[in-house]
Amino acid sequence: NGTASGFESEVTGGFNKLANKYNFIALYPESVNFYDGDTLVNTFNDIIRETTNEEISSICLSDSERYVYPKYPNCDRGRCGWAPCADDANFVKLLIDHFKDNYKIRNVYMIGNSSGGTFVNSYVCKYPESITSAISINGMSRLGFGCTPNQPVNFITYASLNDTSVPPIGGISADGLFYETQESLIKTWVDKFECKEKVSKTYKHFETFNENLFSECLGGIKIVSILNLDSDHMWPEAGYDKETGLSSYTNYGTCVTDIQDEFKIPKCYRTNDRWGSEFILKKLFEFDNVN
C-alpha cells in the first residue's frame, strides 16, 4: 500500500534522477484510496477481466486462516477481494494516450512493484498495443487470473525467492492469498508466442540472480524471467545490508513526500541505492535492440 511519491523516493532511490539521466518522462499513477482508521489504503485493481464474486471468493484461505484486508467502500469484490472496483487499466491507458498525443513519445515502458506488478501482468493482456515493454516486479497474478496478450509485447517477470508476500514458487502467500507461480506465468507467455531459443545465466552483484531469456518469439519479442535467489519482497537489492552481507525485508514506500502532503501518513525519510532501479531500466532498454 505504498504511494506514488513513496515509490519514487524510497523504493527506487529517486527514480526522477534516472529519468533525467536517461531522458524519459516518468509517470507515477495511483488508484483511488481511503482510510481504514488511521491507515491509508491505496492499491491497484489488478483483476481486470470479467469475473464473479464467487470466483474471487475461492482464491484465498478461509477467513480464520488468513489476514482479512479492509475493503473499499461500496465495492464488493468477493470474500478474497481487497482491491478497488475502479477501472485502473483504462485510467492508465488514458494517461498513456494523453502523453502520446501531446509529446513525441518513441517507447512506453511499464514498471510495477508488488500489487503494481500484479496490475502490470493484467494490463499488458488488455492493452498490449499501448506499450513497448513491461516488467512486473514481485507481482504474480492471482490464481486463475494469469493471462497473455493477444499480440506480442516484450515482457519481464522479476521475483524474489524468499518472498512470502507474493510467493513466486509456493503459490500461497503469508496473508493467505493464492497466486500463480512465476514458472507457470512465464510458460504461458513462452508457449503463446512460440519462443524457440532460451539462454539461462546466473550472475551476482550483491545479491544473486537467475535469468532466463527467451527469444526468436512471434513478433520478434523477447520474454525474460529473473529470480533473485537472496531477496524477500523487495525492489532489487533494496533489502541488502552491505555490513552483514544479508538481505531482509524493509517496508519502503508507505510514506509521502511534500508533493503528496494531503495524505495523513509519515513523510519519506529513507532512500535506496539506485543500482536496482538502473538494473531494471537497462533490462527494459535492452529490448530496443529488438524492435
Stretch-by-stretch model annotation:
Residues 1-109, 122, 126, 237-248:
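Serine-hydrolase catalytic machinery in alpha/beta-hydrolase-like enzymes
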Residues 5, 100-153, 164:
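Primarily recognizes the serine-hydrolase "nucleophile elbow" in alpha/beta-hydrolase
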Residues 13, 86-93, 117-121, 129, ...:
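A structural signal for well-ordered alpha-helical segments within the folded catalytic domains
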Residues 15-18, 98-106, 125-126, 143-149, ...:
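Surface-exposed acidic, glycine-flexible loop patches that form ligand/cofactor-binding
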Residues 30-34, 140, 231:
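Short beta-to-alpha linker loops that shape the active-site pocket of alpha/beta-hydrolase fold enzymes
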Residues 78-83, 175-176, 266-267:
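Second-shell loop/turn segments in exported
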Residues 132-219, 227-230:
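The feature captures the conserved acid-bearing segment of alpha/beta-hydrolase catalytic domains
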